[in-house]
Amino acid sequence: MKINLSNYTWEEVKDLADLDPVILLPLGAFEQHGKHLPLKVDEFMVNKIAIESVNKSHDKNIKAVVAPVIWTGYSPHHMDFAGTISIKDETLTNLIIDIVESLVKNKLERILILNGHGGNIAILKNVGQKLKYDKNIYIATSSYWDFAMKEINDWRKSELGGINHACEMETALMLHMEENIVKKNKIEDNPLKRSPYTGVDLLSGGAVGVSASFKELSPHGVIGSPSLAT
């Protein structure tokens, strides 16, 4: 079984549907990640993780295929930094619904949307509700880090506030996936320090949500401690 749906012909997709595979749909973003990481981080990493996950599933005789990555997402909070490309929440909602409906029409119905950007999470929850109640289509959604929270906590070196954006975790993943593109000499730390009632870290969701642009929180686009990444 081929890993990427894009490598199938239409005849092969008809045969693929008979196998009832899991379709992994990666969802990323195209936005600033500090001075040391490229704009592609979210869409690049989630796509790599999806491909590797499907590859490992094949080793266990689990039928799964990766759909083409949705490379941009909801990132208005990063628009003060050059290069960010954001789409409206309703645009992203409709785009995902259209893609899911297309897959379902092709009898590819076991769909997991794998997210790689925090700004997409609320939209994904809404998409799942709309598909269920408006279209009677069931999907699963998750962010890749949700599968590894314990492991992230075990290997992290930073204190609370060190894993957020362009942080220890994302920098470590990019060092593993494409080290030559990381500008190590440009790394700057900026651990978030604010009320404990608001979330300051991937592993510490706060009780209170407060919207803010990244420019208000960081002069260079980093929230966290990327210098500790290995």
Where in this protein do the model-derived segments appear?
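Extended, histidine- and acidic-residue-enriched regions that form the cofactor-binding/catalytic faces
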Residues: 1-110, 118-230
